[in-house]
A protein has these predicted regions:
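Conserved SAM/AdoMet-binding glycine-rich loop
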Residues: 117-215, 220-227, 233, 307
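Auxiliary Fe-S-binding modules of radical SAM enzymes
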Residues: 1-44, 107, 113, 251-417
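Generic structural signal for well-ordered alpha-helices
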Residues: 109, 136-140, 174-175, 212-215, ...
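Conserved, mostly hydrophobic/aromatic
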Residues: 27, 53, 83, 122, ...
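N-terminal pre-triad scaffold of radical SAM enzymes
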Residues: 48-92, 97-123, 185
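Glycine-rich, proline-tolerant flexible connector loops at the mouths of alpha/beta enzymes
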Residues: 36, 71-72, 93, 123-133, ...
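Catalytic cores of alpha/beta
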Residues: 169-173, 234-248, 315-326
């Protein structure tokens, strides 16, 4: 829909909403209060929020929809934290705890690289008594075997844990990770950047203050990060827009975020949902809420973060296609392995092949392109091709549910003597 059509429709909606959307189209910064109004939109106003977000997406990045060929390597599910939303982690005494040795991590990275991956994403639980050099050793081992692969590794929670285990500052530890081969950090462990909220859903998790310190320090060292938000649980829409505004302020200061990813809460196996720990906890966000959240993200971040990624693992293929008209422009990664959403009850698999992504993008009239982690365009496609990963059965990569049952990588509890 062209801008003239949007202008015409804006005359027929609530004046407050119309004013906010007009400001967005004028590329003015949208306040927290104004962004909250977008969540109240109904009827034609609801659709106009999506139209405006789509127009801003078109101006910012055009009709190219990107994806990255990558592999997730969640090398252990053993964790000293017990977050209410996490069905992935296991206590070190549980039988389902696993821990991949460095040689297996490297094997998985090499397998992915040989199938065309440009990135490995490395995240895991926080095992007790962790060797302080573990993260560095893993990165060095990967880079020794595959010097050209991009390591997108270690959330702010893991960085803080590594710094504590090493008894050094966050800055010193990040410098060590960079020297060891870390190229970028996932901006996960953010959930909602409100301390009272975090104390409810994940007591003991990294604080807002420490999360910000890790992110800003990484940016100051030339380490880009992503940014994320987990929504659809007990937070309010005001909590969401304040979270996005906080990320916007960080981006103004550092310019280090490459993307923003709204992450819908997967409830089925999440402890705080299964045991009804919090009054009013929701079963994730519904379809309209998901669409609005991606649109609000684009509108609030328009002048600051170019790339809005949807999570096909959480939303599925059809909803992901729809979100490409609600402000999103990135399909994320091929993944090959996915443990965290799957363990919580997601049903959309762990591998989306490059030719599948390209087809999904073409079906909605946009142009697929493979990108690097930092959003450099590697290949644009006007006709399909056949990549190595397109010919692989996803069973080749194993699964989380197999991993927690086999003995080969079972976590060995150091406290058993």
């Amino acid at each position: 829909m062209n801008i003239e059509s949007i202008d015409s429709l804006l005359k027929h909606v609530d004046p407050v909403l119309s004013n906010v959307l007009n400001n967005a189209l004028s590329e003015k910064e949208i306040s927290v209060n104004d962004a909250s109004e977008l969540y109240k939109a109904q009827g034609i106003g609801f659709h106009l929020v999506g139209m405006v977000a789509d127009e801003l997406r078109r101006r910012r990045v055009g009709d190219i929809v990107t994806y990255v060929v990558n592999r997730n390597i969640n090398f252990t599910n053993v964790c000293i934290k017990q977050c209410g939303f996490c069905a992935f982690s296991r206590d070190f005494r549980e039988e389902e705890g696993y821990f991949l040795p460095t040689e297996e991590i490297v094997r998985r990275a090499k397998e992915a690289y040989n199938l065309g991956a440009t990135e490995v994403c490395i995240q895991a639980g926080l095992p007790p008594d962790m060797n302080s050099n573990l993260y560095e050793d893993v990165c060095k081992a990967i880079k020794t075997e595959i010097p050209n692969i991009h390591i997108h590794g270690f959330s702010p929670e893991e960085v803080l844990y590594g710094a504590i285990r090493s008894d050094v500052s966050i800055r010193e530890y990040l410098s060590r990770l960079k020297d060891a081969g870390v190229n970028t950090l996932p901006g996960t462990a953010a959930e909602i950047l409100d301390q009272k909220m975090r104390d409810k859903i994940s007591p003991g998790r990294i604080t807002v203050k420490d999360w910000e310190e890790v992110i800003k320090t990484a940016h100051s060292l030339g380490i880009n990060t992503t940014s994320t938000m987990m929504y659809g649980h007990i937070e309010s829409t005001e909590d969401r827009v304040k979270h996005i505004a906080k990320l916007r302020e960080i981006q103004k200061e550092t310019g280090g975020f490459t993307e923003f990813v709204p992450l819908n809460f997967i409830a089925e196996e999440a402890p705080m949902y299964k045991h009804n720990i919090h009054e009013g906890i929701r079963h994730g966000a519904n379809a309209n809420d998901v669409m609005l959240t991606h649109a609000v993200s684009r509108i609030m971040l328009n002048n600051y973060i170019n790339n809005i990624q949807m999570s096909w693992v959480k939303e599925g293929q059809k909803m992901s296609q729809l979100l490409l008209s609600w402000g999103a422009n990135d399909f994320g990664g091929t993944l090959m392995n996915e443990s965290i959403s799957t363990s919580a009850g997601a049903q959309h698999g762990q591998l989306l092949k490059p030719n599948q992504i390209r087809q999904l993008v073409w079906e909605v009239g946009k142009i697929p392109a493979e990108r690097s982690t930092k959003y450099e365009i590697l290949r644009k496609f006007d006709a399909d091709t056949n990549d190595a990963l397109d010919n692989v059965d996803s069973n080749q990569f194993g699964s989380y549910f197999e991993l927690i049952k086999i003995n080969e990588f079972k976590y060995k509890n150091p406290r058993r003597g």
